[in-house]
């Protein structure tokens, strides 16, 4: 949520910044409604002041034994008028809140401006792309011999785009998750296994709705709906909603391992088959609450952890600074970490690290007391650390051998009982 006071003070500048994300944005409706709200507040305060004066006159008249009937009627009329104004004010405030809730976060000043991902900038590349002495296989082709995934079984029970892991695929998935969780813990993150269902207001707080309402799975729970989380960012942010932290508590680092549920997975087409784009996947999520001065430090910390893991997994990767047209609704800055997938002949995102400034905390009401005792909104950051489906694809496709086997990254072997190679099921 954006600060209406800043919009009111510098409307042209705010609109210019927002149009870098969406050229169609106009702040005129917001400013017009804000003007109405302020006028109604003034009218309300004026009537309240008049009512107080009349109440004093009534008290004085009664003390002096003077008939106060007319004064009492005036107060009753004022009270009725005030009630109407207050109701109108509540309606206009709700409308203003709704308009503000659809405005994205401002992009940072150093973000490349573009309408889509074509404007993203590769800022770092690490590792050489693999050179094979044989025709490399797509991970679904490798799976025919490895027998670690079963999309057909999942399609029977749930539908297309839902994965089912089996045999050593289960062990490899949990090895990745355990490795990543231990990495977060070693870097001082507090670990969580949170609920997978959240209230609608928690999705609002993290910025997923109202703009993207309808894109999430939900279940009916009495008179309300609970939503399956699209990322643990939602619930980690929600844990501190409406809280007032102390400055000494910050920065506060959280990490969670959860399944994530996304409805849009099936829209990419046949090219992104298998695990490249699915409705359900595991992800370790990093989240931080900071002061404004700690924001950049936390960002670098998250980014370094992601790079550390990709380096230890010995996967070729690159970092891309996202343009305004490819950034999320809540982010002011995002760097994607992308791994090379030989089966796709392209780099694919396995982590997005984002700074969200005070955008989410204003929606969630998360504040802290600064050293002067003044209440301030915290800054929030989030980053995947990491998402497993494409990571597993990268491991399978980059480490495949001519006989269809796959070399296990050394860093994962302790979590697999020392297993060094995934052999085809018949070997």
Curated annotation (Swiss-Prot):
PROSITE patterns: AA_TRNA_LIGASE_II. The gene is serS. It is an enzyme of class 6 (ligase). The keyword Ligase applies. The lineage of its organism: Bacteria, Pseudomonadati, Chlamydiota, Chlamydiia, Chlamydiales. Pathway: Aminoacyl-tRNA biosynthesis; selenocysteinyl-tRNA(Sec) biosynthesis; L-seryl-tRNA(Sec) from L-serine and tRNA(Sec): step 1/1. L-serine binds at residues 231-233, 285, 384. One of its GO terms (cellular component) is cytoplasm. Keywords: Aminoacyl-tRNA synthetase, ATP-binding, Cytoplasm, Ligase, Nucleotide-binding, Protein biosynthesis. It catalyses: tRNA(Ser) + L-serine + ATP = L-seryl-tRNA(Ser) + AMP + diphosphate + H(+); tRNA(Sec) + L-serine + ATP = L-seryl-tRNA(Sec) + AMP + diphosphate + H(+). It comes from the Bacteria. HAMAP family: Ser_tRNA_synth_type1. GO terms for biological process: selenocysteine biosynthetic process; seryl-tRNA aminoacylation. This is Serine--tRNA ligase. ATP binds at residues 262-264, 278, 349-352. It is found in: Cytoplasm.
